[in-house]
Each structure stands twice: as C-alpha cells, then as structure tokens.
C-alpha cells in the first residue's frame, strides 16, 4: 500500500471514529480496507497514534484556529487536520511540507471547495509552532 493510500484510509478511519464515537483503531482501519487489501505499519501507526494522542492533537488544532471551533469544522476537514497534525508532531522523519502537501491533496479528493485552503492555512500556522 502506498503512503498516499494509507493516509486516505487513515483519514477515513478517523472520520468513522468521529461519527460513531468509537475509538477502536483496529476496527476502524479494517472497515476502510477494500476486499483482499491488508493494512500496513504506516496506516496502523497513523490511526493508533492519533487515538493515543487525541487530546494533545485537538488542543494544538484549537490553538491555531481563527474564528472557528474544532467541533464546527466539517468532519472530513477535522479528520484531515488530525491526521496531518499527528504526522507533523509525532513522525519527525517526515518533513512538514510533505505532510501539508499530502493533506491538501486528500482535501482535494474528499473535501469541498474551501477545504484545501482552510487546511493549508491551519497546518501552516501549526508548522510554525512546532
């Protein structure tokens, strides 16, 4: 599985956990996989890492939102932000610009017209604080 695909599956797992309120990364990841597709270490670490650090990640996002509340952001955008912030804060081997670019590409696929600009702005602010 390519890293882009793993990130997309991770975003879908975070989306699912947000909607259901269930923070079970194993089940959420399994529900995103196509038939015959297997998870990989990168995907598992993204979803499991988010669950482990959810409070810290959400607080970091809140501190960098201007005129928005985390709870009012669309679930898709919130999931993309959470995934990217986890990657930026806890996966130091991945350059921040790569993470931001990947988040923007995922937003183009899953978000609305404004998602990519919004996500780029928030993540750029967060990058400056890390």
UniProtKB/Swiss-Prot annotation:
Alphabetized UniProt keyword annotations: RNA-binding, Transcription, Transcription antitermination, Transcription regulation
Short name of one Pfam family: NusB
GO cellular component terms attached to this protein's record: cytosol
Keyword Repeat: no
Single GO biological process annotation from the record: DNA-templated transcription termination
GO molecular function, one term: RNA binding
InterPro entries: NusB-like_sf (IPR035926), NusB_fam (IPR011605), NusB_RsmB_TIM44 (IPR006027)
Disulphide linkage map: none
Family: Belongs to the NusB family.
Primary role: Involved in transcription antitermination. Required for transcription of ribosomal RNA (rRNA) genes. Binds specifically to the boxA antiterminator sequence of the ribosomal RNA (rrn) operons.
Name of the featured protein: Transcription antitermination protein NusB
Biological classification of the source: Bacteria, Bacillati, Bacillota, Bacilli, Bacillales
